[in-house]
Amino acid sequence: MPKAEPVISLENVSKFFGPFQALKDVNLTVSAGERVVICGPSGSGKSTVIRCINRLEEHTSGTIIVDGTELSEDTQNIRAVRQDVGMVFQQFNLFPHLTVLENLTIGPIRVRKMDKGKAEALARKYLDRVHIPEQAGKYPSQLSGGQQQRVAIARSLCMEPRIMLFDEPTSALDPEMINEVLDVMVELAGSGMTMVVVTHEMGFARKVADKMVFMEGGQIIEVAPPEKFFTNPDSDRCRAFLDQILEH
């Protein structure tokens, strides 16, 4: 991949929750079109990194620059960044009283000031892309978990982001529903979308990642291309983690 100016840059980022240090001097860059997968044991700081990139958590020290904008206490900056950064969570966070179509159009209409007809056309385009166009008129409670997560992905895409963040998007799903969500994410990766994904799904990571990141104890322990990461990682801690997770 040709070197490009990073669209995400974290420099010496630390984060405290009270006395607990969740992130310790984290340095990470993500280039346009790059797919980065972050893995590591529970409590290693993976989700905190993702949440800091979208300013859902405020970092304590260090510098975070997203798409040329430094994240600071300037709310205008934060609003601008969030319009260009989509996020998909473990939980689907759909509005239960709105139809699927309404869940997808509310952001473009209210935030992007798009007219309703254009927003609905955009929503149908992305429902088609995640392979559930027939669910537009249903309510979230009428859908399976896998379908709800695909709606959540489509909802993020309706904001036409330049970057997509995924925080363990399959961890709340039944096993038989995981692949239908991962398949959509593989297709999205193939389209050239910049993606940062926290996941334990190593088959997915092997398939799409340009760069693997292993975290433990709030620190980045290893960064490597997938072919090296999965066959010959430098750190013993990373090797032990992979031995454990790849057994299952």
Question: What are these regions, as identified by a protein language model?
Answer:
Residues 223, 227-248:
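C-terminal boundary and immediately downstream tail of ABC-type ATPase nucleotide-binding domains
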Residues 5-226:
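ABC family nucleotide-binding domain
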